[in-house]
Amino acid sequence: FHSLVKRDTYLPFEGICLTDTFQTTENEENVLDQTWFPENAANVDKQKKAPVRVIMGNPPYSVGQKSANDNAQNLSYAHLDKRIAETYAKAAQATNKNSLYDSYIKAFRWASDRIADCKDGGVVAFISNGAWIDGNAQEGFRKCLEDEYSSVYVFNLRGNQRTSGELSRKEGGKIFGSGSRTPISI
């Protein structure tokens, strides 16, 4: 890195924002950030006003969390949850829509809303849980992707190990080794 930037000392990224991304659109002031981290709060405000055309990431998958002690604590985001209810849940025929509030689905909703603010649109690219590809509850999510985007490209890496027998064999094993039984998509 240092040879590429031709310097021996660390050069911090000027606009870095240390924040909970979903919290940035919850329309409430964070007094703690304003008081103790004013430079970071200013960077967050600046980022919120900037046009964003590309969002890339690997959002966490956490809908099955049992308690606050789990590694993937579920947090409530009133505005974001409302947007999911107005879009993905409203378009779904499924009775149980709980999986639409998984963090990776929230990331899609947040990103879709964020690039919609840009008059020329944009690109969202995630490595995510692939259950949305054929899950019953995610029907509304798929409908909204079709409505909100001009093109959708998906690489289904498969890997669903929550199946058994021939179906499990066809999934081709675990994508990330022994730690994950979840199907993955890009």
Task: Locate predicted features.
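Conserved S-adenosyl-L-methionine
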Residues: F1-E28, N71-Q73, F141
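Short alpha-helical segments and helix-capping/turn motifs at coil-helix boundaries
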Residues: F1-S3, F37-N43, A111, A137-G140, ...
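C-terminal, active-site-flanking charged/polar segments
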Residues: F1-T9, C144-S151, F176-I186
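Short, glycine/acidic-rich hinge or "gate" loops at secondary-structure transitions
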Residues: R7-L11, D120-F126
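Extended catalytic-interface subdomain
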Residues: G15-I16, A50-P60, S180-I186
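SAM-dependent methyltransferase catalytic-core segment centered on the flexible catalytic loop
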Residues: F22-V124, A131-G135, E148-V154
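GTPase G-domain guanine-specificity segment
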Residues: D134, F141-C144
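Class I S-adenosyl-L-methionine
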Residues: V152-S185
